Each structure stands twice: as structure tokens, then as C-alpha cells.
């Protein structure tokens, strides 16, 4: 079976070479126009990338918010149906109280589980402070009124 002339490997290679030579001749004849097309293509690519990032970030934050809102709405509807005699509950203040309690728990939680870890952390802080002092004291002072020449 013989391939048609338009799809033979020699014809494909010649078409590629012909296209490369045509592009080179266009660039050599119109360098400003070629530069304009190149810069325009780069700018369009950057704008499309930025748009994709913005859309991805906004969709990502929206997807994170929705399950929480849906959960709260389901909870409100179930509490309204079960507690119709008690009245409506203020979920905003309830959430703020929970956040405040969670914050207090993190403040009261001991980060270091043992005295050895606490001692290591204190030694590390002291070492960092000493290194910082050495670094600050080791820097040469360059006052504006003094000459840089050491030999007067």
C-alpha cells in the first residue's frame, strides 16, 4: 500500500522546512511586528494564567465555605423543627462563644510536655539571643562624619 503524495514523510519534512523558512523570512523582514506578536502572546498567556489562578482560588474558597453553611442551615432547620416551643436560637453568638472557648483552651494548653523540652527550648532561645548579639556587635560602625581613610 502506498501513501498519498501529500502524506509521505518527505513531503511532511519539506513542509516543515518550508514553514520554518517562511517564519524566518517574516521575522527578518518585519522585526517590529514579530516582536509585537511575541510580546502580545506572552501578555495574553500571563492574563489567562492569572484569570485561571483567580478562578481556582475563588472556587476553592467557595467550596470550603459551602459545606459549613449547608451544615449550619441543616442544623438550624432541624433545631427549628424540634425546638419550636423554645424559640429561635442565636447561632451567631453560639458560634462566637465556641470560638472563644476554643481560643481559651489553646491559651491554657501546655506546649511543652516535659521539663526537658522546656529546658531545650530555653537554651535554644538563649543561643539565638547570643548569636544575634554577636552579629549586631560584630558589624562595623560607619558614621557619616568620620573619614573612611584610616591614615590621617
From Swiss-Prot:
Residue spans crossing the bilayer: 35-55
Region (Necessary for the localization and biological activity): 1-60
Family that this chain belongs to: Belongs to the EVA1 family.
Function: Acts as a regulator of programmed cell death, mediating both autophagy and apoptosis.
Membrane topology: Single-pass membrane protein
Lineage, uppermost ranks: Eukaryota, Metazoa, Chordata, Craniata, Vertebrata
This protein's UniProt keywords: Apoptosis, Autophagy, Endoplasmic reticulum, Lysosome, Membrane, Phosphoprotein, Transmembrane, Transmembrane helix
Protein name per UniProt: Protein eva-1 homolog A
Biased composition (Acidic residues): 82-92
Main localization of the protein described in the UniProt heading: endoplasmic reticulum
Phosphoserine modified-residue sites: 114
An annotated GO BP: connective tissue replacement
UniProt cross-references to PANTHER family, sorted A to Z: PROTEIN EVA-1 HOMOLOG A (PTHR48422:SF1), PROTEIN EVA-1 HOMOLOG B-RELATED (PTHR48422)
Annotated compartments: Endoplasmic reticulum membrane; Lysosome membrane
UniProt-listed InterPro entries: EVA1_A/B, EVA1_dom
Region described as Disordered: spans on this chain: 70-97
A Gene Ontology cellular-component term: lysosomal membrane
Designated gene of the protein: EVA1A
Phosphothreonine modified-residue sites: 106
Pfam families reported for this sequence: FAM176 (PF14851)
Tissue distribution of the protein: Expressed in lung, kidney, liver, pancreas, placenta, but not in heart and skeletal muscle.
Amino acid at each position: 500500500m502506498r501513501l498519498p503524495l501529500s502524506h509521505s514523510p518527505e513531503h511532511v519534512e519539506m513542509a516543515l522546512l518550508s514553514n520554518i523558512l517562511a517564519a524566518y523570512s517574516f521575522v527578518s523582514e518585519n522585526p517590529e511586528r514579530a516582536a509585537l506578536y511575541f510580546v502580545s502572546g506572552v501578555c495574553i498567556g500571563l492574563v489567562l494564567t492569572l484569570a485561571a489562578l483567580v478562578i481556582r482560588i475563588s472556587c476553592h474558597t467557595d467550596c470550603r465555605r459551602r459545606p459549613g453553611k449547608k451544615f449550619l442551615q441543616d442544623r438550624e432547620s432541624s433545631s427549628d423543627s424540634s425546638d419550636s416551643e423554645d424559640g429561635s436560637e442565636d447561632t451567631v453568638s453560639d458560634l462566637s462563644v465556641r470560638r472563644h472557648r476554643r481560643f481559651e483552651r489553646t491559651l491554657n494548653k501546655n506546649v511543652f510536655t516535659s521539663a526537658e523540652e522546656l529546658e531545650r527550648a530555653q537554651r535554644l532561645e538563649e543561643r539565638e539571643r547570643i548569636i544575634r548579639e554577636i552579629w549586631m556587635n560584630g558589624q562595623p560602625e560607619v558614621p557619616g562624619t568620620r573619614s573612611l581613610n584610616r591614615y590621617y
